Swiss-Prot record:
UniProt GO cellular component terms: nuclear membrane; nuclear pore transmembrane ring; spindle pole body
Coiled-coil blocks: 542-602
Protein name: Nucleoporin NDC1
GO biological processes: mRNA transport; nuclear pore organization; protein transport; spindle pole body localization
Oligomer and partners: Component of the nuclear pore complex (NPC). NPC constitutes the exclusive means of nucleocytoplasmic transport. NPCs allow the passive diffusion of ions and small molecules and the active, nuclear transport receptor-mediated bidirectional transport of macromolecules such as proteins, RNAs, ribonucleoparticles (RNPs), and ribosomal subunits across the nuclear envelope. Due to its 8-fold rotational symmetry, all subunits are present with 8 copies or multiples thereof.
Stretches for region Disordered: 380-407
Perinuclear space side: 42-52, 125-144, 229-271
Location in or out of the cell: Nucleus, Nuclear pore complex; Nucleus membrane
Keywords in alphabetical order: Coiled coil, Membrane, mRNA transport, Nuclear pore complex, Nucleus, Protein transport, Translocation, Transmembrane, Transmembrane helix, Transport
InterPro entries: Nucleoporin_prot_Ndc1/Nup
Segments on the Cytoplasmic face: 1-20, 74-103, 166-207, 293-646
Length: 646
């Protein structure tokens, strides 16, 4: 008996590819560091000003350390998918207490501090940035300019860390392998080639420069505002305490009267800010571009060189880690679109432990798409009612009750309206006062007396009614207060506003992360394999599942369309400010269009064989409506392309 072929895990092929991409991003950081080191060179010697083993190389190594911190941070925190939450304040509450938040802020602050030390060491002596200055009689004085520059760069690092967390820079925007206009364009490997990614990085350089300049100006304004208000006295005392044992400094810790905000100082701070911001932005851009290359190697799928390519691919598709599963699904979509040999291998792979390869791929893709429906059901499901505890009699037995049983009314039920309660009390009090006399109520009243009593009571109630018409509850009061003073403001109400875009992403893509490319590639892969089976499935195993595939895609497409486009997701009461782009979610729209396009491909290819697939005319008509097709195709009586399985 032949030995079973070892199935290598999918990560054995993905990890080397990712490591090569990490190395390429590191080279970009090194080139950026060497370029900035050249900018700070004094060019007093034609050799040592640029030679890597001289002072320039030492500065480049330290600058490289500042950039590599960002790469290490990205490696430890990268994730596919967008963060899904109903409001920004919900995102803040969920992610702010985590260790990764402190790690991000500390990484950028440490990188900025190291950069400030290197930059101060390269500033010319006549710039006035030495730590100790000497005036008359050789008396040493502490210079505030380097203190402000270092503080500014550290604050800029914290500011960049906050922007990093707010913009979710750690997210990887994975691609898709959808056919364009129904045609399958062959994958040549250019999307995953290093030269293509470097060309894209080069095209991003002007944007990186503009972004660095803009953020540097914002950071300088922030530092100039916070430094004298919060940090100046403390930092001055700390520096005086540390340097007084080394220099003959004054005993007083009072800072100078003038702030170090001269034009030359601010220009130096701005130049240093642009350099360090450029290093950070270049590192982040290179990492984001290079890591999301297509799962191809030399124009072939990553698992092409495996001993068991289908088994390794299945291992990735079944992996519980979202990043590995997304890359494996992306590779499957490429196979369904561009690689007929691998498609035939999937159709002909029958002797697997858990069933044929096609059956497992079909189930995995449909389970992935069913997640969308499950997410919608979970989001729209009403909260479970609170369970009432059993009565004490069931546990202690029947005993004689000595008091009235407890009330079972809802304790949080609203009180009767002020209007009805007031009217009832006034009416009863007025009638009792009228009927009561010195000797008690009379036995009866005359008709005239009754009419007079009724008219007086009505006039009194009408006069008191305007004061008791409006019912005010605490919830309605605070809601009106929030709508009037907080949510109506575009800036103040932003953290609490639950926009339709955010709620759509949470409802459809799930939480805490939702990766649209996973669902797009799943729909593209299963539909592409089904359509290709007409020519490449020699045994006709795929056609057994075509009818159920059409029904599942029809049901899912109808549910998504009803929820997203037909009012299934209403407008939240906090969404009171009309902002452009907040009404639609691009990621959800991409998923909806992918499901619709997959259904269109399958129904166009298999509608002529609907009778043999046991699809009714109603099912075909419904599928065409969901897919957006109009004209019907005549059903063929003879189907030589298909193999009927009885």
């Amino acid at each position: 008996m032949a030995a079973a072929v070892r199935r290598s895990p999918y990560k054995d092929f993905l990890q080397p590819a990712l490591q090569r991409r990490f190395a390429t991003a590191t080279l970009v950081v090194l080139a950026t560091a060497y370029f900035e080191a050249l900018l700070l060179a004094r060019w007093s010697s034609w050799l040592w000003s640029w030679f890597p083993l001289g002072p320039t190389g030492f500065r480049a190594a330290l600058f490289f350390l500042c950039g590599i911190f960002v790469i290490i941070l990205r490696i430890s925190q990268y994730h596919p998918g967008i963060r899904t939450s109903d409001s920004p304040i919900a995102t803040l509450v969920r992610y702010a207490p985590r260790w990764t938040t402190f790690e991000t802020l500390f990484t950028y602050a440490l990188s900025a501090w190291i950069f400030s030390l290197v930059y101060l060491g390269t500033v010319p002596d006549d710039a006035g940035f030495e730590r100790i200055t000497y005036f008359t009689y050789d008396r040493a004085r502490l210079n505030e300019k380097p203190i402000f520059l270092t503080t500014h760069l550290v604050l800029l690092g914290i500011y960049q860390g906050v922007r990093h967390l707010y913009s979710d820079i750690d997210r990887l925007s994975l691609g898709t392998a959808q056919p364009s206009n129904g045609d399958s364009s062959k994958a040549t490997g250019e999307d995953g080639h290093v030269s293509t990614q470097m060309r894209r990085f080069r095209d991003q350089l002007p944007k990186i420069v503009v972004h660095s300049l803009h953020q540097s100006v914002m950071g300088l304004l922030l530092s100039a505002s916070l430094y004298p208000l919060l940090l100046r006295d403390l930092l001055w005392r700390v520096n005086m305490t540390m340097l007084r044992p080394l220099y003959s400094l004054p005993r007083t810790n009072v800072p100078p009267a003038n702030l170090p905000y001269s034009p030359s100082t601010l220009l130096r701070c701005l130049a240093a800010s642009v350099m360090v911001m450029f290093a950070w932005t270049a590192a982040n851009t290179a990492f984001s571009l290079l890591l999301v290359k297509s799962p191809l190697k030399n124009g072939k799928p990553l698992t092409a060189d495996a001993k068991d390519p289908n088994g390794s691919l299945l291992n990735g598709l079944k992996n519980k880690k979202l990043s590995i599963k997304c890359f494996a699904m992306w590779e499957l979509a490429y196979i369904a679109r561009d690689f007929p040999d691998r498609r035939k291998a999937i159709f002909e792979d029958m002797d697997r432990k858990d069933g044929p390869m096609w059956s497992q791929v079909y189930k995995i893709c449909l389970d992935t798409l069913h997640t969308l429906s499950s997410n919608i059901d979970a989001y729209t499901a009403p909260p479970a009612p609170a369970t009432t505890p059993q009565q004490a009699e069931t546990a202690l037995g029947d005993k004689p009750r000595t008091s009235a049983p407890p009330k079972e009314d809802h304790i949080f039920a609203p009180l009767p309206s002020n209007k009805s309660a007031f009217r009832t009390s006034v009416s009863s009090a007025f009638q009792n006062a009228a009927l009561a006399g010195p000797g008690g109520p009379p036995a009866s009243l005359s008709p005239v007396a009754k009419r007079t009593l009724h008219a007086a009571r009505s006039r009194l109630l009408e006069a008191a009614a305007p004061n008791a018409e409006i019912e005010v509850t605490p919830s309605s009061f605070f809601r009106e207060l929030a709508l009037k003073y907080v949510l109506s403001s575009p800036l103040a109400g932003y953290p609490f506003r639950q926009t339709r875009r955010r709620r759509l992403a949470s409802a459809v893509l799930g939480s805490p992360y939702g990766e649209p490319s996973l669902y797009v590639n799943a729909a593209s892969a299963v539909s592409g394999l089904a359509v290709s089976s007409l020519r490449e499935d020699r045994y006709g195993h795929v056609q057994r599942d075509v009818a159920s595939l059409i029904r599942e895609l029809t049901s899912l497409g109808e549910k998504l369309n009803a929820f997203v486009n037909e009012g299934g997701m209403g407008k939240h009461w906090t969404d009171v400010v009309e902002l452009e782009g907040e009404d639609k979610c691009e990621e959800v729209e991409e998923v909806v269009n992918a499901v619709k396009h997959a259904l269109k491909r399958v129904i166009v290819a298999f509608e002529p064989y609907a009778r043999d697939l046991r699809l009714t005319r109603g099912e075909v008509k419904k599928a065409r409506e969901v897919a957006g097709l109009e004209q019907e195709v005549e059903v063929r009586e003879v189907m030589p392309e298909m193999v009927q399985i009885r």
